Amino acid sequence: MTDDKKKGKFIVFEGLDRSGKSTQSKLLVEYLKNNNVEVKHLYFPNRETGIGQIISKYLKMENSMSNETIHLLFSANRWEHMNEIKSLLLKGIWVVCDRYAYSGVAYSSGALNLNKTWCMNPDQGLIKPDVVFYLNVPPNYAQNRSDYGEEIYEKVETQKKIYETYKHFAHEDYWINIDATRKIEDIHNDIVKEVTKIKVEPEEFNFLWS
């Protein structure tokens, strides 16, 4: 990477199911585009790939497999997009991502009772985000929505376990806790304030789990 090339920023949204990640990530992408920032919006799992289609059937409870197998598939789904993400960032394009490796650890360790260190190992070496916005809502926040429960992890007791596991990342300096029980506009405004603090300057990549 040349010194005069500004690397794009990598922003991740994390949180429980139905915490507002899709809404807030879309709003941020719109904001960046309106401010002449070239940006790519990604989602994990990406259900369009071969691996992603298997994951999608699992989440919809249309197939079953061992806990270890599904965890490794989630990780593989992230790895198959690493070249794309790296290429975008090197071109100066920002990447906004709905879920990332932190979901893998929180869900597999919290919901499936897999060892936390074991869960982290497959994602070691993935590109580290510049900032993670954790949309913090209570585990029972979305239980009254009409479509709640359609996917395998959408149970309040399961969400409670995942919620506790997410706390392992709260000490990271790039992890920003956002109260997501408020109005959509207020949440978005807080996120924009944090994004404007991100320095855009030449730098090398950092990787998980450094």
From Swiss-Prot:
The UniProt record gives the binding positions of dTMP as 17, 47, 74, 78, 99, 107
- Effect caused by changing residue 108 to T: No defect in thymidylate kinase activity. 2.1-fold reduction in affinity for dGMP
Concerning InterPro entries, the annotation shows: P-loop_NTPase, Thymidylate_kin-like_dom, Thymidylate_kin_CS, Thymidylate_kinase
Which Cys-Cys disulfides exist here? none
Q: What domain of life is recorded for the organism?
A: Eukaryota
LID: where is this region?
A: 143-155
Q: How does activity depend on pH?
A: Optimum pH is 7-9.
Tell me the residue numbers annotated for binding dGMP. Answer: 17, 74, 78, 99, 107-108, 153
Q: What class of enzyme is it?
A: transferase
Outcome of mutating residue 74 to A, per the record? Loss of thymidylate and guanylate kinase activities
> What residues does ATP bind to?
18-23, 182
- Effect listed in the UniProt record for changing residue 108 to A: No defect in thymidylate kinase activity. 1.3-fold reduction in affinity for dGMP
Which biological pathway?
Pyrimidine metabolism; dTTP biosynthesis
Catalytic activities: dTMP + ATP = dTDP + ADP; dGMP + ATP = dGDP + ADP
**GO CC terms for this protein?**
cytoplasm; mitochondrion; nucleus
Which GO molecular function terms does the record list?
ATP binding; dGMP kinase activity; dTMP kinase activity; guanylate kinase activity; nucleoside diphosphate kinase activity
What UniProt keywords apply to this chain's record, in alphabetical order?
ATP-binding, Kinase, Nucleotide biosynthesis, Nucleotide-binding, Transferase
Q: What Pfam families does the record point to?
A: Thymidylate_kin
Q: Which NCBIfam families match?
A: DTMP_kinase
Outline what the protein does: Catalyzes the phosphorylation of thymidine monophosphate (dTMP) to thymidine diphosphate (dTDP), the immediate precursor for the DNA building block dTTP. Can also phosphorylate dGMP and to a lesser extent GMP, dUMP and dIMP. Can use either ATP or dATP as phosphate donors in presence of Mg(2+).
- Which family does the similarity line name? Belongs to the thymidylate kinase family.
Q: What is this protein called?
A: Thymidylate kinase
**Source organism (scientific name):** Plasmodium falciparum (isolate 3D7)
What are the top taxonomic ranks of the organism? Eukaryota, Sar, Alveolata, Apicomplexa, Aconoidasida
